[in-house]
Amino acid sequence: MILEPDTVIDLFLQPGGFYWGKGNIRIRTLLGSCVSICFWHPSLLYGGMAHVMLPFRPSSIHSDDSLNAKYAEDAFQLFFEKLEGFKKQYQIKLFGGASMFSTEEEKLLELKSVRDIGMKNILSIKEHLIRNQLLISSEDLGGFSHRRIFFSLWDGEIYVERPEHT
């Protein structure tokens, strides 16, 4: 077990954000239908997080060759540019992908594609993992509420905070 450093730098990852690093950094984010992908190398003690908002880049948005972690495909490319050693040495953890609409709101929504964005994000990310022959070491996906994620880059521990349901 690695002890928490005396000084911790707290980094809030915005939607569509990506961070890779090591040391005394704690990445935190807030998820609803978005999915957080976390890579961690337990021997080298570094990793990162992407806050994915959409399963793919819409065809109407032209890529200027810059990667954007807002989209699942781009997020994986950003990770693959950072990885050292074999991809299979990394622990991969997934969080989020909730359905953020209540039953009443779901009845009002005519655009099913908007309502199902959390599940579409989950499926897209899992397809990328399968395609790259990568395994998930842990996940907390789906459901009907937001999550706060805290990822400590000094030891790879991830804490998930969910609202209490009454």
Curated annotation (Swiss-Prot):
It holds the Pfam family CheD. Keywords: Chemotaxis, Hydrolase. It is an enzyme of class 3 (hydrolase). GO terms for molecular function: protein-glutamine glutaminase activity. Its EC number is 3.5.1.44. It catalyses: L-glutaminyl-[protein] + H2O = L-glutamyl-[protein] + NH4(+). Signal peptide: none annotated. GO terms for biological process: chemotaxis. Probably deamidates glutamine residues to glutamate on methyl-accepting chemotaxis receptors (MCPs), playing an important role in chemotaxis. Belongs to the CheD family. This is Probable chemoreceptor glutamine deamidase CheD 1. It comes from Leptospira interrogans serogroup Icterohaemorrhagiae serovar Lai (strain 56601).
